[in-house]
């Protein structure tokens, strides 16, 4: 065993080369001297007494600083001999790099340089140091700010999260967690070099986010080996999967790379195309990563983490949100509608400045019924579903103008797919953005047939933008099930649509 220089202290540790072996702490309080042998350590005390501490013959380092976390051998690689330094494929300790909370293993075929993990003939070069830097930033945000884990009460108090770089050119990016070969739980993720460098590190942060989601159940689950009763380890409404993992992982990653949230040319564009769908629709799962900012503004920076930790078996996120915040269905609809109205101008803490160049970019989803009378209606391809929404850019009126929208919710229009007509509901209102960046929010209406209106103020300059916002707001919630590989319309309760017709006064869609 190697021995580090001793400092004046009362304890030393053994850090084994086999990182799956728990570190050993040895008391040297009041010692005059110590003697180290191959498999034992003798501590000599002032009164001529001697304490002998048995050590294993395993290779390791005796050190005077706490080595911190070690590793749990994952069942995923139960047959892998990580101590085999002559391995010609797979993983071993010789091809790994550690930080405080994470370890990166790369396939031995990549070679021994942690800064050049490259598949032959491929231009993507991963760097284990960079991976660890991103991962540690994730730890700081996901634990310290978002509250996914509670230090001192987590499996990560003992075990590092494991990240692997498999030997392949084709895209691979996945993460969650697994059981240890002898019990326990560990977070585990994989990304090949292409994925490791993709999106400026966003993919790493996304996959690391999945390990934290898994570890919620590992820390809090009570149902035995699977720990499937916490942290959304289930589907709902008859499905076996859920897209909330992806929605939150992308949102988590944007907390690490906030400058990408409205500029990366990917998820925001998908969001604009898909947000008429059910909030929990599988087709929207990767791009539904913006409502979380509103919920955190309303209930605190750690609210999404608390949702993951406080959800109960079988609940979907809407049910968890309603229960946690002691709301009824109508109140939930009102809160969600407020968030969507704020999204018209991105009037949300944390994104307000970064998203300002995106104001006015929502898609027009209304077709003209009568130009002269300014009557418009939805179309089946993009009609709102439960908790989906439209934000329509409207012609800007002069200050002092009263704009009106005579709204009619439809439950018998041809070409639409109706589910639970008796639960049909809508929310609708105007939002104005003034020249001095003041936001003016109109009264939200919920009547199947009613009129929303807004007076454009005269004391904030001209009106820069006017929007009409409509949300699908069922009077009673039902879950949207999904199983990977099955189309959403496999379930009869899915693909609900809430069409509407609206006639405007003093403005029109543009």
Can you describe what each PLM-predicted range is?
Residues 9-72:
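Compositionally biased alpha-helical segments
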Residues 118-130, 191-199, 233-239, 274-282, ...:
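Second-shell loop/turn segments in exported
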Residues 314-510:
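Beta/coil-rich, acidic/histidine-enriched accessory regions frequently appended to metallopeptidases
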Residues 186-261, 287:
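Zinc-dependent metallopeptidase catalytic helix centered on the HExxH motif
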Residues 269-349:
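Active-site-proximal alpha-helical
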Residues 143-161, 220-227, 238-242, 262-268, ...:
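Surface-exposed patches in mature extracellular/periplasmic domains of secreted proteins
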């Amino acid at each position: 065993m190697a021995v580090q220089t001793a400092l004046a202290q009362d304890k030393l540790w053994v850090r084994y080369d086999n990182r799956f072996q728990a570190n050993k702490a040895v008391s040297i309080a009041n010692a005059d001297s110590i003697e180290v042998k191959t498999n034992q350590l003798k501590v000599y005390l002032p009164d001529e007494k001697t304490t002998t501490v048995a050590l294993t013959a395993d290779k390791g380092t005796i050190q005077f600083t706490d080595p911190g976390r070690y590793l749990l051998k994952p069942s995923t690689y139960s047959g892998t001999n990580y101590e085999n330094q002559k391995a010609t494929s797979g993983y071993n300790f010789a091809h790994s790099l550690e930080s405080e909370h994470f370890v990166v293993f790369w396939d031995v075929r990549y070679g021994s340089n942690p800064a050049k993990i490259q598949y032959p003939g491929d231009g993507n070069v991963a760097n284990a140091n960079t991976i660890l830097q991103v991962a540690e930033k994730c730890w700081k945000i996901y634990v310290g700010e978002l509250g996914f884990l509670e230090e001192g009460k987590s499996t990560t108090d003992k075990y590092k999260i494991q990240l692997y770089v498999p030997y392949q050119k084709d895209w691979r990016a996945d993460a969650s967690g697994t059981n240890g070969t002898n019990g326990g739980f560990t977070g585990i993720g994989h990304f090949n070099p292409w994925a490791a460098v993709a999106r400026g590190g966003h993919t790493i942060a996304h996959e690391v986010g999945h390990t934290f989601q898994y570890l919620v159940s590992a820390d809090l689950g009570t149902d035995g080996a699977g720990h499937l009763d916490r942290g959304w380890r289930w589907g709902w409404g008859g499905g076996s999967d859920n897209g909330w993992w992806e929605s939150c992982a992308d949102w988590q990653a944007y907390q690490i790379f906030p400058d990408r949230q409205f500029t990366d040319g990917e998820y925001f564009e998908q969001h604009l195309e898909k947000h008429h769908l059910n909030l929990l629709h599988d087709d929207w799962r990767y791009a539904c990563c913006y409502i979380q900012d509103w919920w955190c503004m309303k209930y605190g920076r750690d609210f999404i983490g608390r949702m993951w930790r406080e959800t109960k078996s079988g609940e979907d996120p809407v049910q968890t949100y309603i229960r946690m915040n002691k709301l009824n269905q109508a109140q939930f609809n009102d809160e969600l509608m407020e968030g969507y109205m704020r999204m018209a101008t991105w009037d949300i803490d944390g994104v307000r400045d970064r998203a300002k160049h995106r104001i006015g970019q929502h898609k027009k989803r209304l077709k003209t019924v009568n130009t002269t009378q300014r009557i418009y209606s939805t179309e089946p391809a993009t009609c709102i579903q439960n908790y989906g929404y439209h934000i329509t850019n409207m012609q800007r009126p002069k200050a002092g103008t009263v704009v009106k929208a005579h709204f009619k919710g439809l439950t018998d229009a041809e070409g639409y797919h109706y589910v639970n007509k008796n639960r049909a509901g809508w929310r609708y209102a105007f939002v104005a953005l003034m020249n001095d960046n003041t936001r003016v929010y109109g009264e939200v209406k919920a009547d199947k047939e009613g009129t929303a209106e807004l007076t454009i103020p005269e004391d904030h300059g001209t009106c820069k933008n006017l929007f009409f916002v409509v949300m699908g707001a069922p009077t009673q919630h039902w879950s949207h099930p999904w199983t990977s590989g099955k189309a959403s319309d496999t379930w009869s309760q899915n693909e609900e649509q809430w069409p509407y017709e609206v006639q405007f006064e003093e403005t029109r869609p543009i």
